[in-house]
């Protein structure tokens, strides 16, 4: 069998982590089995679909390095095909036109709720003589079987059984003539020869209806796998209130694609106790057999842990490329300071996000106008004057600008003034960086350069003597 999977998002908003996990699992299943992965944009909700959302989907997939073999396809380019099948269903009696008004349907729903029944269409138009009604607005409903069961084997959940009596007649075409998502997806999967439909459990209730439609047109039924939902700490479906954001917002917050992919892979799937997976390992090891059925808890701290791991372990040049993006976003010219690789080396063990790293290294690329207020109160006191002057003089006379020579100067100053290294380094740190938090000050001075270091020490001395 030639395995084919697909990812079929709706372009009505940002691409969120739940959708990305679905895309990842579908992609990995195809890659593991030597199959094809298709990207399909389900844009039949014309009022809510936007080009911005389409761009966000494609940009997100590219950023995550989830590539596709075919597509992107768009449902709105296939409307004639959907209407062809709808007409086929109308002709063979597997579908019918429904003329029920919104008012009637609302009254029906309220009556069912009041009487403790599950809201569902009652089949009012199911047996109407359709030839007697003309030129009235209507929807088209699928005539769902009223007897028997729909039974299928979910590749994650096992055998699932639905009684057809529990299923109402699904709308497959709206009043304005636009086919519904639940119908279009069936025809697309059929025409694209999708063999495995991997999607979220929120689609589980659609599956028996879709299987019945496939049987009505004499088509094969694909394999199904429904992923458990992702929840927040309150046990509810993950949403914006849990700080869940779109994929490109994670990029903008300083997360690496490797971290997000690795975290989402483990959010519902495991391979022994292994936590870290390369892309090649993901493709080799992934299996639906070990995808868990229960809901997965989204843990922002765990995602940060993954991100910090990759910041520390991926190549310096690769991290520097991501740092370049964030510095440019902040309006910083990275060519007005030290090499980005040097910055990565200084900060990679301290910063959990690339945005953090960019914010922490700004003083390397632009001069600050004032010192951190609290740091200046504590460390830029008259008692620091002699220490800063001594270091300033020694740095001025230093011609061999190396890390070792700077370390020697700081040690010499501490020895000459009979003070601790901390008594030298803290006022010097505030002077050169503007803050009391930074990597080792000798490394900072070495990377930031002689001219800028001396200029800032002079600024600190003037601040003290105001």
Swiss-Prot record:
The keyword Transcription does not apply. A motif ('HIGH' region) lies at residues 9-19. This is Glutamate--tRNA ligase. Keywords: Aminoacyl-tRNA synthetase, ATP-binding, Cytoplasm, Ligase, Nucleotide-binding, Protein biosynthesis. It catalyses: tRNA(Glu) + L-glutamate + ATP = L-glutamyl-tRNA(Glu) + AMP + diphosphate. Gene3D superfamilies: 1.10.10.350, HUPs (3.40.50.620). Coiled coil: none annotated. A motif ('KMSKS' region) lies at residues 237-241. InterPro entries: aa-tRNA-synth_I_cd-bd, aa-tRNA-synth_I_codon-bd_sub2, aa_tRNA-synth_I_cd-bd_sf, Glu-tRNA-ligase_bac/mito, Glu/Gln-tRNA-synth, Glu/Gln-tRNA-synth_Ib_cat-dom, GluQ/Sye, GluRS_core. GO terms for biological process: glutamyl-tRNA aminoacylation. Belongs to the class-I aminoacyl-tRNA synthetase family. Glutamate--tRNA ligase type 1 subfamily. It comes from the Bacteria. Catalyzes the attachment of glutamate to tRNA(Glu) in a two-step reaction: glutamate is first activated by ATP to form Glu-AMP and then transferred to the acceptor end of tRNA(Glu). Its main location: cytoplasm. GO terms for cellular component: cytosol. It is found in: Cytoplasm. The lineage of its organism: Bacteria, Pseudomonadati, Pseudomonadota, Gammaproteobacteria, Candidatus Palibaumannia. Monomer. The keyword Protein biosynthesis applies. Its EC number is 6.1.1.17. ATP binds at residue 240. Pfam families: Anticodon_2, tRNA-synt_1c. It comes from Baumannia cicadellinicola subsp. Homalodisca coagulata. GO terms for molecular function: ATP binding; glutamate-tRNA ligase activity; tRNA binding; zinc ion binding.
